[in-house]
From Swiss-Prot:
This is DNA mismatch repair protein MutS. It comes from Prochlorococcus marinus subsp. pastoris (strain CCMP1986 / NIES-2087 / MED4). One of its GO terms (cellular component) is cytosol. Residues 49-62 have a biased composition (Polar residues). GO terms for molecular function: ATP binding; ATP-dependent DNA damage sensor activity; mismatched DNA binding. InterPro entries: DNA_mismatch_repair_MutS, DNA_mismatch_repair_MutS-lik_N, DNA_mismatch_repair_MutS/MSH, DNA_mismatch_repair_MutS_C, DNA_mismatch_repair_MutS_clamp, DNA_mismatch_repair_MutS_core, DNA_mismatch_repair_MutS_N, DNA_mismatch_repair_MutS_sf.
Length: 915
């Protein structure tokens, strides 16, 4: 049996100790087959726990194989008699009882195993073999399934992707050869969907959020005050905020696509699940969220005396959520489990978010405008983010995604971002130089985070070093920027010399192209450490000795192709072709026979082998020690590295927006601030284009359109046939607004854009099967949300209201909603509709204007112009659209007759009068 390898502060076996071969003496292979049979008859060996199998094969018995079957009590760790289990399984059950809501992977030799119901579960989930293990003579067989330790990352990634948490129990000591004594094992890692830091488990261009929620007592029916705190453990970002109403809470949760949500009680879990059953929650100790424990946790984590400096003094709900989150992270932190205080989850100081700081885009609007994914297929390609992301680094891509999630309301910050884009557009050399720097830049945010947690590989540290070496070049670029630019650029203007010294130190100590795993050696440069150099000299000497020994044995045996080779199980051996066996000298000891090869050892080789292993093990240990010293130095600079990395990410995002602007002819919009005076509110876009559709069109030019909002034109009634471009146009307005408020240039010829506080959309609707709501009820719920939350500074985009009920009911609702938006809320609104009767609103309201999508009809053919012009349409061309869609001619002809009859007998248009 091989000696077990130890994983030191590393889940995926990148820091093994070198394995040593079993040096036990071998029995000479000099007994014939007949002699062996006689020997077995003299001393028969008894098979254990298989009496029924013996009976079956010796006596042709059909008796049941009871001991080979898994009985019902042995299926679950909860029902098995723990005291009757083997020591290893008893330990497994103890750990499983402490982690009942997580999958426990238990290291046995070269495998991580699951037992009982976990084994059945992962065998189905991962499609791996389900087998069994003897749990003791009174228990019998129990289910077992496992994965090889070297493939752990791949399988863990699959489990995490399916929203399961994993507990890793590893071996904490190496085998001593006394196989009667179980090795010491313990939990070395708890991995949850929201706390992974391994590259293979993360989406490079997305944040991986873990969110804690605290709900206070409801202040009125269904109106809870809440606090949420979310962190990306891999990048160190930490955000917290407060709010009211469950709907706003879910907007925040769903918008960020959080990977894991923790709450303090089952009551809160039940309340939230009643609102949305598609989100999974983890319930942790309720005390984590108490104000006293939360405050103490926050102070201890950030090593501060007061919360005032964090801005949390009067934010009790946010404080409780933050305390609950930090407490949870400390509980599952691997450094606590390994008693190593040098390793920890490193988070930045919390950034408090207030609604007044950002444009609010609820989940429904994100979905309707296809901001990050398409509405129908949920694909990235075809989204707004897809259309503008030209970033070179993963850091920049995540930064751009965060900006789109939370566009700015601060006009100064918007203008400063625009200024950097202008700098890039005005200088091709500036663009090219920055591209060359960023093109090979590593993900400094996550790389430094892995170093802080003790999981960075040698290649990770080299990537950090290479990234830090580029800082002086970035500094020179930032100094060339004209105009007023954001304050975060100071991180690049004032580079910490210690970071550059750290980069040089990494390059001095680590080789440029290190192996993937530390167990392979060859990480540290020669000349770095005298002890390591001395050990390497000895290794070279032993290598020379082996070469000389090979030449000597060739000469003695006269076998020219003889080789001395190494096998991890057998150690060093002499290998010869089987045809040369007759030339083997007498001092060779036969080790192994293969099909075409014979293997031997000599006393000299075996004696020297132990010394070789001793030196190699010492060298490997010294090399790992030196590597850890470098990694700890990087860990100490994690916060500083991340500060610089965030500035680099912003530069990358803005460079990408500049490239997008150049490629797609975007222009710099003029931005005006929010104002409470409707007379001063104005948005004017000339030649606006839909940034998504324009890039998807490959064989024709996109038709641009204008839009104007002012005190005389707050509500636009947009009419026109189906498939004429109404939905594309209203989405276009929302997308241009978002681009303007993230500081981007926009697809237009000219744009003067007023900042808005929220964007609301109601575009299309389907039945909500999870809540049992019909299409019409979903539509009305969305409409109610808009009417109750919109302000005069909001942008409202409506595509049909009042469908799914009778014509007169629908028209009445659409009319009333339109008038409420124009008279009561007085916000910028586009209402696309087939109710042509709404064109009459212009005559009774001074801030309503009618627009239509132009079409041309020649004989029986309909041509869509996709051009928006003043005036209301008087025909929907629904029958013509149906004809284009391929509806049978017979149905079309009948529809024409019915329409003619209805138009002649419907006096609604003539009779409609609104007081």
């Amino acid at each position: 049996m091989e000696e077990d390898t130890i994983i030191q502060k590393d889940l995926f076996a990148i820091n093994h100790e070198l394995k040593r071969p079993n040096n036990s003496s071998q029995i000479p292979d000099d007994l014939s087959t007949e002699e062996l049979k006689k020997e077995s008859q003299k001393r028969p060996r008894q098979r254990k726990n298989s009496t029924n199998l013996i009976n079956k094969f010796k006596n042709n018995s059909n008796s049941e194989r009871k001991n080979d079957c898994i009985n019902e009590k042995s299926y679950s760790y909860k029902t098995v008699e723990k005291q009757k289990l083997t020591p290893i399984l008893k330990h497994y059950v103890t750990l499983k009882e402490e982690n009942s809501n997580r999958l426990l992977l238990y290291r046995l030799g070269d495998f991580f195993e699951c037992f009982f119901e976990d084994a059945v579960f992962i065998s189905n989930l991962l499609e791996i073999t389900l087998t069994s293990k003897d749990a003791g003579k009174d228990i019998g067989k129990i289910p077992m399934a496992g994965v090889p330790y070297h493939a752990m990352e791949r399988y863990c990634a699959e489990l995490i992707k399916k929203n399961h948490s994993v507990v890793i129990c590893d071996q904490l000591e190496k085998s001593t050869g006394n196989y009667g004594t179980p090795l010491k094992r313990g939990i070395t890692r708890i991995i949850t969907p929201g706390t992974v830091i391994e590259e293979g488990m993360l989406v490079a261009k997305k944040n991986n959020w873990i969110t804690a929620i605290h709900l206070s007592e409801n202040i009125s029916e269904n109106l809870y005050e809440w606090g949420i705190s979310r962190a990306d453990v891999s990048t160190g970002e930490l955000l917290t905020m407060e709010g009211q109403s469950i709907s706003k809470l879910f907007d925040e949760i769903i918008k960020l696509d959080t990977s894991e949500i923790i709450i303090g009680s089952n009551e809160e879990k039940k309340l939230l699940e009643n609102q949305n059953q598609q989100i999974t929650y983890t319930v942790t100790q309720e005390t984590f969220f108490s104000i006293n424990e939360a405050c103490l946790t926050i102070k201890n984590y950030f090593q501060i005396l007061s919360l005032e400096g964090l801005g949390l003094k009067h934010l009790n709900n946010a404080t409780k959520a933050l305390g609950g989150l930090l407490n949870y992270l400390e509980k599952i932190n691997p450094s606590n489990l390994e008693n190593d205080s040098s390793l920890k989850i490193s988070l930045d100081f919390p950034q408090i978010q207030f609604p007044k700081d950002h444009l609010i885009i609820d989940y429904q609007t994100q979905k309707n405008l296809e901001i990050k994914n398409t509405q129908r297929e949920n694909n990235y390609a075809g989204s707004l983010l897809w259309s503008i992301d030209r970033t070179y680094t993963c850091m920049g891509a995540r930064c751009l995604r965060r900006w789109i999630d939370s566009p700015l309301l601060n006009i100064d910050e918007i203008n400063k971002r625009q200024n950097i884009i202008s700098n890039f557009l005005e200088s091709k050399k500036l663009r090219t130089d920055t591209q060359n720097i960023l093109r090979a830049m590593g993900d400094l945010e996550r790389l430094s985070g892995r170093a802080c947690a003790g999981h960075a590989s040698p290649r990770d540290l080299i990537a950090i070093s290479e990234g830090l070496k580029k800082l002086p070049r970035l500094k020179s670029i930032v100094k060339l920027f004209k105009y007023e630019i954001p304050s975060w650029t100071n991180q690049l203007k004032n580079i910490d010399n210690e970071l550059l010294e750290l980069a040089d130190l990494i390059s001095f100590k680590l080789v440029q192209n290190p192996p993937l795993n530390t167990s392979e050696g060859g990480i540290i440069h020669d000349g770095v450490d005298n002890v390591l150099d001395g050990l390497r000299n000895l290794i070279d000497d032993y290598s020379d000795w082996l070469n000389q020994e090979e030449l000597k044995e060739r000469k003695i045996s006269k076998i020219s192709n003889l080789k001395i080779q190494f096998h991890k199980n057998f150690g060093y051996y002499i290998s010869i072709n089987k045809s040369k066996v007759n030339l083997a000298p007498a001092h060779w000891i036969k080790r192994q026979t293969l099909t075409n090869e014979e293997r031997y050892v000599t006393t000299e080789i075996k004696n020297r082998e132990s010394k070789i292993f001793q030196v190699k093990n010492r060298a490997a240990a010294k090399e790992y020690e030196l590597f850890c010293e470098v990694r700890n130095l990087v860990s100490a600079k994690t916060k500083r590295i991340r500060s610089v990395a965030k500035a680099i990410a912003c530069i990358d995002a803005l460079l990408g927006l500049a490239i997008t602007s150049l490629e797609n002819n975007f222009i710099k919009p003029t931005i005006s601030p929010i104002t409470n005076s409707t007379d001063q509110q104005s948005t004017k876009i000339i030649g606006g284009r839909n940034p998504i559709v324009e890039q998807l069109l490959t064989n024709r030019k996109f038709i641009s359109n204008d839009i104007l909002f002012n005190n005389k034109q707050k509500l636009i009634i947009l009419t026109g046939p189906n498939a004429s471009g109404k939905s594309c146009f209203i989405r276009q307005i929302g997308l241009i607004q978002i681009l303007a408020q993230i500081g981007s240039f926009v697809p237009a010829s000219k744009a003067d854009i007023q900042i808005v506080d929220r964007i609301f959309t109601r575009i299309g609707a389907v039945d909500d099967q999870s809540t049992g709501q019909s299409t019409f009820m979903v539509e009305m719920s969305e409409t109610a949300s808009i009417l109750n939350q919109a302000t005069s500074n909001s942008l409202v985009l409506l595509d049909e209201i009042g469908r799914g009920t009778s014509t007169f009911d629908g028209l009445s609702i659409a009319w009333s909603v339109s008038e409420y938006l124009a008279k009561k809320i007085v916000c910028n609104t586009i209402f696309a509709t087939h109710y042509h009767e709404l064109n009459y609103l212009k005559h009774t309201n001074t801030n309503v204007e009618n627009f239509q999508v132009l079409v041309k009809q020649k004989k029986d053919q309909l041509f869509f112009c996709h051009k928006i012009e003043k005036g209301g349409a008087n025909k929907s061309y629904g029958i013509e659209a149906a004809k284009l869609a391929g509806v049978p001619k017979e149905v079309i002809n009948k529809a024409i007759l019915v329409l003619d009859y209805l138009e002649k007998n419907n006096q609604l248009n003539a009779q409609i009068k609104i007081k």
